[in-house]
């Protein structure tokens, strides 16, 4: 083995593990491993920057590299070799001057991985700019022209056929319902069961039957991206109907800030490696949306620094290429805009023109009511706020500013101390006015979160504790006294569609009424009857309000054990991770307990005692 690798470069996926294992084995036989080492994990992270996972199985799947028997030595080695060739191919596709810039940062790659960049650079004879623009040493994609929109057929099934989709009877009924709703001038509330393909069911009829722009609002950013990259992309490919994701400026990279960060070499190796990753990503992205970097959570502080503030100067080096600027232009030119409920409310509060003269579709409208509830209040963690104030005090050169900050710090600390003694939960009006006065005398960039919380729109303020396993977190809350009425956000001229599987809350009240609508049209598609489906309700289960976690868990365990005797597979769904873990701890039956970790993007097992019966 030593003779095989003596004059070679040692390449591995996670080379630190393999090289250390080999070096230890060779050492005991009297040899030293002196071969240069190259890590395909780090190289893949830099040159394929938008992947979610970089394990060998995951990246082979993304790059369509055959991996027949994962975790077997020969199969993994072959796959790593093919991955290495793919990485070299990607490097050689980049502009030569960009590769030179990456080489300047390549000492931040693990071991001797920079040798790969040197080797590729030596083989490049000319600049390879493809569809890229050199913008002060940062390569960006050239703007793509928006094609002329094609007319959709008035026949829903024909449009489906052009998209290569099969007809579904329930979806067609829903589309017909949307077409009927287009004819009336009142807000339309359409109820139809989940899973029938409602997105195409409302987009295609609205594009065919109306001329105005369409704004689609969904509850989450994830669903927002799914629609844009799924249905929106498919419709754009066939009908040239431009579909754009509408987000806050904070979602986009500010090129001026990134350019400045490139002029410094940070102490953190991984942060400098991240700069390499972003330089490659900028040659690929058309949006500049930082969420395209799936592992952004690893560099949270740096990404917050790079996030756009919504301001762009005409003197900027990147004026005309700024991503927030370009996204605003695309939003104005696009026929379909997709956003999320929270951002929609934030924009409409200040600017109703966003949807004026347009069609607004609120998908999963039942979630809008919850968003309105959240919109009527705001909170901030007091410990972090006090740390921010202390940092500002230590950095401020103005005596007046320091005195004002110290005053705010003292008042907040006193309020928290009284709260923890149990004497005062609600913040009195005179203290709020004092804090507002101090803030008004400070420069506008100080304590932005506290300024937003103490905004005049909030009328009631209080302190609240959240208890976690290791610590207690105190938060300052502000809220409106009355529930926000959605109608107050709307301009006079807008066509409204509210779509959900659950619009009817009870016989006495509907979602339309909760949102503040009196005159509206309700359309209902009866749910499909599943003859083999049965639902049982446990009438003996006690009221959950005030029920201790341990008692709640024990009651669930008892019911699982009774159901276990049916010999049918059991799936138990929880809304609380703590309850899941408590049940798993008490359950003696073989089972698999899992919960999702958003930070790591995967399901974590809490107990693995596999059984075909309980999951």
What kind of region is each of these model predictions?
Residues 6-16, 20-26, 49-51, 55-118:
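Acidic, Mg2+-coordinating catalytic module of metal-dependent nucleases/exonucleases
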Residues 145-190:
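Conserved pre-motif I regulatory segment
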Residues 153-157, 212-214, 218-335:
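A substrate-engagement module of RecA-like helicase motors
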Residues 183-204:
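Walker A/P-loop
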Residues 225, 229, 317-336, 341-438, ...:
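Signature of the SF2 helicase/ATPase Hel1-core->accessory helical subdomain module
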Residues 311-335, 350-351, 435-552, 588, ...:
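A contiguous, basic/glycine-rich beta-loop/short-helix subdomain that forms a polymer-engagement track
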Residues 538-574:
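Conserved interdomain hinge at the start of the Helicase C-terminal
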Residues 574-597:
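Conserved helicase motor "Helicase C" RecA-like lobe of SF1/SF2 P-loop NTPases
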